[in-house]
Amino acid sequence: MAFQGPGRSLPGQLCAGVFGGLIQPPLGQKFYCPNGGSGGGGVPAVPSPLPQALSAPQCNGDGRGEPEPDRPIGYGAFGVVWSVTDPRDGKRVALKKMPNVFQNLVSCKRVFRELKMLCFFKHDNVLSALDILQPPQIDCFEEIYVITELMQTDLHKVIVSPQPLSSDHIKVFLYQILRGLKYLHSAGILHRDIKPGNLLVNSNCVLKICDFGLARVEELDESQHMTQEVVTQYYRAPEILMGSRHYRSAIDIWSVGCIFAELLGRRILFQAQSPIQQLDLITDLLGTPPLTAMRSACEGARAHILRGPHKPPSLSVLYMLSGEATHEAVHLLCRMLLFDPLKRISAKDALAHPYLEEGRLRYHTCMCHCCYSVSSGRVYTADFEPTATNRFDDSYEKSLTSVWQVKELVHRFITDQQQGKRPPLCINPHSAAFKTFIRSTAWHSSKVSKKEER
C-alpha cells in the first residue's frame, strides 16, 4: 500500500483539501505553480514531428480549462508508471511506483541497483531520476516512488501506427538509441532488455532509453555465470538463445539491430513462438554459423544447429524490408546482426557509420541540449556522443546479505539524495486518484525470479 506521507507527519496533516494531485509537499511546504507558456519560436524540429494522436495527452500549460487528471500510463514486471503533476512547478511528470520492494533479497538488490542507476545517469538519451519521493519511517517503508521526465509515447506504438516513417525518422531514432547505448556501455552497464517498448519518444522525435529493471554491470570475469532470463525473446541475441553462461554488451547491439530492421520493415524481424524457433529464424537469415561462433553455446544448442541442414546466408532479403533499406542501411544492419558476438559492431563504431551522418546532423541541429544557436549560427559541442565520466560502481552488492540491511541502505540513499535539492514530495492520500493508485500494481510478483541475479 502506498505510504501516507512522510513518517514524521500525521496522515491528516498532508492536505488541506479533499482533492489535489497525487503527489504534494509535506505539511507546511507551499509552492507557486506558474501558468507557464508555450515557449518561444525556434528552428522547426526535423524530421517532421510525430502526430499527437500517437502521444500521451499534453499538459495544459496555460492555466486554462480543466487540469489533466493523474492516471496510469504503463505497467511492467517491476513497477507501475503514472502521469502526475509536480505541485512545485505545475509540470507533468512520470511517477514510477515500485511496490513490494522488500519481499526478498534478490528483489531488494535489483531495485536498489535500478534506483542507483537512475540517479547515476546524466545523458539526454537515457531516462534518469528527477526526484525520489520522501520515504516514511523505515518500519513503514515498503514502496519507492521515482519521478522522471514524462515522455509522450514509445517506439513500439510508433512502429505499429499508420504514421509514415521516413529515412530521416529512422536515422534520427537509430542515432539516439546508439548514442544512449554508447553512454551506458561506457559506464559498464548492460541494459539487457532493449526493445521498442523501452524506448520512449516525444512528438519532436527525441528518444530516451528506459526501464533498467534487468540492467546490471558487465561481468568481466568470464568464469562468472550470468542469468539467461533476460531480453524479450524477439530481441534476444543468439548467444543467449544458445545457453551462453557469459555475455557482454554485444547482446544490446543485437537488440538494436532487430529494432533497426523493425523500423525499416514495420514488422518484427524474428517473430517466433519459442526460443528454438527463434534460433531457427536467425539461422534462416544468417546461415549456419561456424563452430567458432558457437564457442560459448551449451551442448544441446550446438547439437541442434549441427544436426540440421546446412543453411546458406540469405541477407539479400533485408533489402526487401522497405524502400528505406538502402545499401548503407543494410551494411550497418548486417554489422549489428552478426552471429558471433565478438565480431558484432560496438555502439561507438556504429555511430561512426556513414548511414548515421544525417541522423547526427539533424539531432544536433535542432533537437539536442548540448548544442545551441547564436545570432551568427549554431555552436556545436566538442563531443557529439559523450561517454560516462566514470563506471557505475556495483561493488556494494557483494556486502548485501539481508533484506533489512538493504532496506536501511535504500532508505538512507533516498534521504541523502534529497539533501540540498528541491523541497520534498510525498503521496497525497486525499487525492481523487489515490484509491486507484494504491490498487495499481506490477505484474504478479510470483512471476519474477527469486534466484540470485547476475
Curated annotation (Swiss-Prot):
The active site is at D193 (proton acceptor). GO terms for cellular component: cytoplasm; nucleus. It is an enzyme of class 2 (transferase). CDD domains: STKc_NLK. It comes from the Eukaryota. One of its GO terms (biological process) is nervous system development. Residues 67-356 form the Protein kinase domain. Its main location: nucleus. One of its GO terms (molecular function) is ATP binding. InterPro entries: Kinase-like_dom_sf, MAP_kinase, MAP_kinase_CS, Prot_kinase_dom, Protein_kinase_ATP_BS, Ser/Thr_kinase_AS. Negatively regulates Wnt/beta-catenin-signaling during development. Plays a role together with sox11 in neural induction during early embryogenesis. Involved in TGFbeta-mediated mesoderm induction in early embryos, acting downstream of map3k7/tak1 to phosphorylate stat3. Augments the rnf138/narf-directed ubiquitination and degradation of tcf/lef by enhancing the association of rnf138/narf and tcf/lef. Phosphorylates mef2a to play a role in anterior neural development, including eye formation. Interacts with sox11, hmgxb4/hmg2l1, rnf138/narf, stat3.1 and mef2a. This is Serine/threonine-protein kinase NLK2. It comes from Xenopus tropicalis. The gene is nlk.2.
